[in-house]
Every structure is written in structure tokens, then in C-alpha cells.
Amino acid sequence: MCYNIEGMNGEIKEKAPKIFNQISRYNPDIVFITEYSEQDVLALDTLLKKQYPYSSEDLHNEGSYFYGKHPLSQAQRLKDITSGEYIGVFLCDAYVNNDTIRLLGCHLFSNNYDSSHIRVTPDSIRNNYEVLSYIKNIKWASEKRQKEAQTAARMIPEGCQALSMGDLNDVCGSKTLRVLESAGLKDAWWEGGLGYGATIHHPLPYRIDHIMHSKDLKLKQINIVDSEGVSDHDALYAVFEY
């Protein structure tokens, strides 16, 4: 399961029981959570640790975490190979029985931030100049996401069982997803989902959260998990056979 819980607004302490119940309802073996603020870590972490004894605790200050029922390697946040800057991709290996599954948790760069990391949203646009500026920013952010995806793709050795999951901030068919597909990953929703599969609904419905898998992991089912107002994103849940 992957879930952007919109936790940077400081409200997770109140929402934690509902988020935990949503996750528990599906009982996934692995959960990747994004937008998890440092001050709210304990509220949800305490609940999840009852069900998930393994977690990537060293990522707590980065707002993205893995939780697992199976042992996890020490997670690492990847860096851009050219600039050396940290990117929104987190690597971790899960040890399931006698197999190793590579996990790539993603929270890729948003269209709603410019090169100075200043938040700019469609709702804040006031004139034609800002429309053009936002369109240019979309192009710049898209290129940045492609580079993030390229870095992630390099971490998938040939023949490796792998899952990529999270908020990619990009849609099916985008260059970002095509980069990951070129590394041998398949779009789980495209393969087995029902309907459009939007995971955000404002300002327009889009599927920007994705689970992608290597071909040796056979998809059994994939579902949208309604956030029920807890987050601006719905979660994604998938079942695989290997």
C-alpha cells in the first residue's frame, strides 16, 4: 500500500486512528507513507508499530517511511547523480521468506513548487502572466521528475524483483512513468485496475499515485482506498503473487 496522508498540516495526531484503521482494513504486508511531519511521527507510528514491527526509522525527518511485516534493510534517500542533491526517491529492500524485493518509495517533485521551492498552485493564479509562469513551471517540474525516475530506474538490477510505489505527481503515459517502464516495471493499475482510478480530485481528478512492479511479481488485485477526507490523496492497495 502507498498513502500520501497530507500530514504536513500538523493534523495527523487527530487523524492517526482513522488512518491506522484504513490501513488495517486492508492489512498490507508493506506500507509506504508520505507527507508525514516530524512533529506527528509518534501519533501514527505508535499505532502502526503494533502491526508492523519493521520500519525505516532513519527517514522520519524526510516525511516518507516504509513499514513492513517482514524485515527491511536500512533505507536510504537517493541523490541525483549529476547534482548530488537529494531527490524524492527512497530505497529499501524487503526480505520476504527467502526472497529479496527491492522497494522504491516515491514522492516526486510537484508542479506546485517552483525552482526556489516556493509553493505556486492553480488557485493562486491572478493574471495571464502567472498563467504562463505556471505552465513553464509544469515543464520544468516534469523534467525534474524524469531525472528522479532515471535515478530510481538505475537502482533496479536486471532480474530483480522490484516494486515502485507512491506519489509520482505524474499521470499514466507521462515521460516519468515511461522511464520506470523502461526499467522493466509495469503499471499495476493499467494492468488490473477498474476505471479511471483517480487518486486526487482537486483541481481535477488525476491518478498521480502509482504502484509499479517487475514482471516476475504477478498482480492479483489493485484497489483505490478512499481517504474519507483524511487526505487530499486516496491510497493505493495491491496484492501480488511471486
Label each residue range with its predicted role.
Residues 1-9, 100-109, 131-135:
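Active-site-proximal beta-strand elements of phosphoester/diester hydrolases
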Residues 3-5, 36, 108, 167-168, ...:
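Active-site metal-binding loops of divalent metal-dependent hydrolases
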Residues 153-162, 168-242:
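Metal-dependent phosphoester-hydrolase catalytic domains
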